[in-house]
UniProtKB/Swiss-Prot annotation:
Its main location: membrane. InterPro entries: AAA+_ATPase (IPR003593), ABC_transporter-like_ATP-bd (IPR003439), ABC_transporter-like_CS (IPR017871), ABC_transpr_MalK-like (IPR015855), ABC_transpr_MalK/UgpC-like (IPR047641), Mo/tungstate-bd_C_term_dom (IPR008995), P-loop_NTPase (IPR027417). Keywords: ATP-binding, Cell inner membrane, Cell membrane, Membrane, Nucleotide-binding, Sugar transport, Translocase, Transport. Residues 4-235 form the ABC transporter domain. NCBIfam families: PRK11650.1 (NF008653). Part of the ABC transporter complex UgpBAEC involved in sn-glycerol-3-phosphate (G3P) import. Responsible for energy coupling to the transport system. This is sn-glycerol-3-phosphate import ATP-binding protein UgpC. ATP binds at G37, P38, S39, G40, C41, G42, K43, S44. One of its GO terms (biological process) is carbohydrate transport. It is found in: Cell inner membrane. Pfam families: ABC_tran (PF00005).
Length: 361
């Protein structure tokens, strides 16, 4: 096991494009760290820099107390699991897992012991003589993880390993990866664009956007106290509702919040009112119901603000302007076109500065 520390790490490509813009964070010994963000945020580039597959323009990467900037990937004592499995199609499962150890000159009895132990842990012992084409997607991913395990690395690196699997298998493999990492107690850095995957796997969440880190913390910390409007809207499904306060009637309802420019409310923190009165210190919002999604035990109600107030989104085009989402119990079913009032208490309100870059507590 080993800790991983990044100090002011930067990556600039020829032509001047800066993909990574001075990133600092540390992953503790045995910790499961997830890098999450939208496509193009730099998370995979950063992982490849840790692996040694991308050069570093500036800064330092430290693995286990050793700066590895100029050290070859094979000598960094890491193992990487890729999105496309990267298995040799002409080799058996056994030989795929043993190949790297043979190249390192390890003795046959030691190779055999490591391969069979990894196969036992991953429950793929009956598959050792099969070729990759004879395996399902989930089985191939287990083989790819087995190839990483036999190296007994200090750090596991995962580059969106579940993105090629169907939804049901993704959930099953997500659980398997977390159980495996805890069992081996090995430091892991995992890249994904799926915020649900990130929330369920991580000890530490690193939310990235545009080559910078927006927030670092445990999944619950990031969900409950997002540092910026980007984090508020990216972490959570459905995303947080964000509303401009400048010149808005909502500002008059707020107790405190001086300097706030944006109000955020999670969909589950809004409740339908029957008498139209907001809780003390909270807010009440009038909506016209535009759509209702029924998903069994709960429903998602989509509405537009009746008073014309503006909703904002750090991801233009992803949500209609002015849309508010409310999560309600499944048995509640407002009629389309109906006008309703929803409310949230003061302790469930999130306030941000006008630019959305700073949380105001």
């Amino acid at each position: 096991m080993a800790s991983v520390t990044l100090r002011n790490v930067r990556k600039t490509y020829p032509g001047g494009f800066e993909a990574i813009k001075g990133i600092d964070f540390a992953v503790g010994d045995g910790q499961f760290c997830v890098l999450v963000g939208p496509s193009g945020c730099g998370k995979s580039t950063l992982l490849r820099m840790v692996a040694g597959l991308e050069t570093i323009t500036a800064g330092e990467i430290d693995i286990g107390g050793r700066v590895v900037n100029t050290i070859e990937p094979a000598d960094r004592d890491i193992a990487m699991v890729f999105q496309n499995y990267a298995l040799y199609p002409h080799m058996s499962v056994y030989n795929n897992m043993a190949y790297g150890l043979r190249n390192r000159g390890m003795k046959k009895p030691d190779i055999d012991a490591r391969v069979r132990e990894a196969a036992r842990i991953l429950e793929i012992e009956p598959l050792l003589q099969r070729k990759p084409k004879q395996l399902s997607g989930g089985q191939r991913q287990r083989v790819a993880m087995g190839r990483a395990i036999v190296r007994q690395p200090k750090v596991f690196l995962f580059d969106e390993p579940l993105s090629n699997l169907d939804a049901k298998l993704r959930i099953a493999m997500r659980v398997e990866i977390r159980k495996l990492q805890r069992r081996l107690a090995t430091t892991a850095i995992y890249v994904t664009h799926d915020q649900l995957e990130a929330m369920t796997l991580a000890d530490q969440l690193v939310v990235m956007n545009g080559g910078v880190v927006e927030q670092i913390g445990s999944p619950l910390e990031v969900y409950r106290k997002p540092a910026t409007t980007f984090v508020a809207s990216f972490i959570g499904a459905p995303p947080m509702n964000l509303m401009q306060l400048d010149g808005d009637a909502l500002r008059g309802q707020l107790a405190g919040g001086a300097g706030a420019g944006v109000l955020g409310i999670r969909p589950e923190d809004l409740t339908l009112l029957t008498d139209g009165s907001a809780p003390e210190g909270g807010v009440a919002i009038e909506l016209r119901i535009e759509a209702v999604e029924r998903v069994g035990p709960e429903s998602f109600v989509y509405g537009s603000r009746s008073n014309g107030g503006a909703a904002v989104s750090p991801h233009p085009g992803e949500r209609p302007a002015g849309e508010i989402i409310v999560r309600v119990p499944g048995e509640i079913a407002p009629e389309l076109g109906a006008r309703v009032t929803v409310a949230a208490p003061r302790q469930k309100l999130h306030l941000f500065d006008a630019g959305g870059r700073r949380r105001i507590d």
